Amino acid sequence: MKVMEGNLVGTGLKIAIVISRFNEFITSKLLSGAMDGLKRHGVNENDVTVAWVPGAFEIPLIAKKLAESRQYDAVIALGAVIRGATSHYDYVCNEVAKGVSHAALSTGTPVIFGVLTTDTIEQAIERAGTKAGNKGWEAAVSAIEMANLLRTFA
C-alpha cells in the first residue's frame, strides 16, 4: 500500500494569509497563532504575505486572486463570524465556506479554512488561543501539510 501525506516542514514555502478586519479583536489572535505556527515549522516570516479584507464575505475573492497568482504554496483564510439576531450569519458562513472551497478547487492551490463560525463571542475567544487552542495555528499547520502533499504530485 502506498501512503501519501504531507510533512510539516515549512522551509522554503511561500504562504499568503487573507484575514478579515471585522471582529479584529478575535482575528488578530488567529493571525498571531498562524504566524507562530508557520515560524515554528520553518516558514520564514519574509515568505508570508498578509492581506486584510473588510469582512469575512470578502475573503474568498482575495483568497482566489492570491491562489491564482501562483506566487504562494498555500493560502490561509482567517476570520470570525459570530451569530447575531438575524439570518445574516447563515448567509455569510455558507458563502464564505463555499467561496474558500471554490478558490482551492479552481486554482489547485490549498486554501485553508480558518474562519471561526461561532454562536457566541465566548466561543470565538476560546478558539482564538484560550480553552480550545488557536484555530489560526491549526490552519497554518494544515497549510504546510497540504502544500507539501501537493508537491508529491509534481
Swiss-Prot record:
Xref: InterPro entries: LS (IPR034964), LS/RS (IPR002180), LS/RS_sf (IPR036467)
SUPFAM superfamilies: Lumazine synthase
Binding site for (2S)-2-hydroxy-3-oxobutyl phosphate: 85-86, 127
Reactions the enzyme catalyzes: (2S)-2-hydroxy-3-oxobutyl phosphate + 5-amino-6-(D-ribitylamino)uracil = 6,7-dimethyl-8-(1-D-ribityl)lumazine + phosphate + 2 H2O + H(+)
One cellular-component annotation, GO: riboflavin synthase complex
Subunit structure and binding partners: Forms an icosahedral capsid composed of 60 subunits, arranged as a dodecamer of pentamers.
Protein name (database record): 6,7-dimethyl-8-ribityllumazine synthase
Gene: ribH
